[in-house]
Amino acid sequence: FIAGTYGVGKSTLCDKLCRKLNIPAFSAGDLISEINGETYGKNKVVKNKIANQNILISAVEKKLSLYPTFLLAGHFCIFDKSDEVEILPEFIYEEMPIVKIILLETDFDRILRNIKSRDDKSYNLDSIKNIIRLEREQAEKISSQLSIPLHIHKMDFAESDIKQISTIIQGSAT
C-alpha cells in the first residue's frame, strides 16, 4: 500500500515502479471512480467515504483475482468539502490483504506547489501540516494494529526514490 497525502507523488512514483518492477499499480480513487462514476480530479471531494471504502474492497478483490500482486496508492486521511481532515475508516485496511505500507512524505511547501501545479488548488498551510501529521499517525496506528510493516520514505523526486522503494517492495529492506 503506497500511502501519502495529496501531492506527495504517489501516482508518479507508482507509474515508474510499475514499469521497473513489472507489477500493476492502481489508485484507490481510480478504482472507486470506475464503479461509482465520481471523479476525484481537482476537487478531491468525497461524497460518501463509507460507501467508497466498501467499493474499494470489492475492486481490490477483483484485481486480486487477476493479479497476485499489485501496488495500491491511497490515503489514510482525506479533506472534506471544507478542507477539514477526515480520517478514513479503519475497517478498510483490515479487509484488504496489505503486505507492506509505504508512507511517502515530503515538505509541506513541496506538497502545496505540487497540488497547485497539478490541480490549480490552494490549501492553507495549516491544513497541509495537519493532514501530513494525521496521515503519519494513521499509518503508524494501522501498521501497529494489523502487524503490517511500515516504511516511511522522504521523497526526493529523483531516481533514488524508485531505487529505494523498489528495494522495499522486493523485500530486501526492513
Give the ranges of each region predicted by the language model:
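Conserved substrate/cofactor phosphate-moiety recognition/catalytic segment
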Residues: 15-56
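Loop/turn-to-beta-strand initiation segments
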Residues: 66-75
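Hydrophobic anchor at the beta1->P-loop junction of P-loop NTPases
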Residues: 2
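ATP-dependent NMP and nucleoside kinases share a basic, alpha-helical "lid"
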Residues: 75-118
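Conserved glycine(s) of the Walker
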Residues: 9
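Small-molecule kinase domains that catalyze NTP-dependent phosphoryl transfer to phosphate-bearing small molecules
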Residues: 121-162
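P-loop (Walker A) phosphate-binding loop of NTP-binding proteins
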Residues: 5
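Conserved Walker
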Residues: 12
